[in-house]
Amino acid sequence: MSEPECLIEYMNRHKDWAVIVCLVGGGQEIHDGEAGIAEWFNAINEHFPSWKVFCSDRMAGYEYVGNSSIDEFLSNAEVHKSRGLHLSVSMRSFRSELVSAFAKAIIDGDEATATELYPKIIQIDSATNKMRYPILLTRNLQTAKEWVRNISHGTERYGIIASSGAKRLRADGVIVPKDIEVEKWFLNGKDDVNSSYFMEVAASEFKIQGLEIDYAVVAWEADYRYLDGKFTYNNFAGSSWSRVNNPIAQNYQKNSYRVLLTRARQGYIIYVPKGNVEDATRNPKYYDQTYNYLKKIGVIEI
């Protein structure tokens, strides 16, 4: 029994009526057992068709219902769609409500939409030349670290975040461990080597999902690389990369980058490694097209 089915079954015991309010984000499934809004729809359609469903009319994207549709998922239930039920303003990135849409466009390979959104997000002030919500690009890790240090003030938190599949960042001196001391990473101060401030240990999508920091260095590895006009899915095991062909695993990997690109409250810088021609696991061609793709979108490089 799935978690949605279990909860609905429990609420279904009420003799008169009951309401379940679900706040479900799209594209947040990053591991086995996570199925998002689709699992709620399945539970209602297959086991509780007498329940009425009131939902947003904008849940048509792949990150919500895959290749299906709301009507197909809920063919046995009564459905009421309303634009007013779509929570489109991000409470995480309070300086720009378009950050999530920009992240979606990037990972979808939607260059045109990403290019259109980028200047609307950063909003450069003509008087001060400062960005409202900076999103930058670099191929120098030290430059990325210096940027987040310099732009933050007081107790504003910064750190490095990376995909759990970013195994070769180790060559740059950045470890992405399976487990970190989360409370120390997020809460401890600049005098603790285990805190995010030291930028030696990166938090993966599993550790930062549902949380956020003020400024982030988003390290973009070769696991989700842009190649010949589209993103490819890759896994590092042993001493080499291999393609990921399972559609479910591909979706988890894509969503991992969606999570990473939406964790910064006030801005972030994307670090794309240069690679190393003498290291077959860090071949520059694994990174160059991703970098060029982001440059073509217009992301400002420092």
Task: List where the protein language model places each region.
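Conserved RecA-like ASCE ATPase "motif II neighborhood" in helicase/translocase motors
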Residues: 1-13, 200-204
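Loop/turn-to-beta-strand initiation segments
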Residues: 15-21, 52
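Flexible, charged surface loops at secondary-structure boundaries
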Residues: 12-15, 148-155, 262
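Conserved helicase/translocase motor-coupling segment
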Residues: 29-38, 45, 51-226
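Well-ordered, non-membrane alpha-helical segments in soluble/globular domains
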Residues: 1-7, 34-41, 67-71, 141-142, ...
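C-terminal accessory regions
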Residues: 19, 201-302
